[in-house]
């Protein structure tokens, strides 16, 4: 199982609409509105890393109102 965490920034006024669209996407396990440098934190899990990253590139980044993302890949030790 591959896990990534996506840190997302959105345009002013877009937080609610973006937050509602993300849980509908494949492999999304959790969505949280956060404080600090980013607006939203998303946990995505999938069988393969390509599958998980596709959710980011073809899903989250395409949502109107998303201005930037940073993806953190969980490392299994």
Regions found by a protein language model. Give the residues of each.
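A compositional/biophysical signature of low hydrophobicity enriched in polar/charged and small residues
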Residues: 1-77
């Amino acid at each position: 199982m591959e896990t990534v965490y996506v840190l997302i920034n959105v345009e002013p006024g877009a937080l609610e609409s973006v937050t509602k669209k993300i849980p509908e996407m494949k492999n999304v396990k959790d969505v949280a509105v956060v404080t600090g440098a980013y607006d939203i934190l998303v946990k995505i899990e999938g069988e393969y890393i390509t599958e998980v990253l596709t959710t980011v590139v073809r899903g989250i980044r395409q949502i109107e109102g998303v201005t930037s993302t940073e993806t953190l890949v969980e490392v299994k030790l």
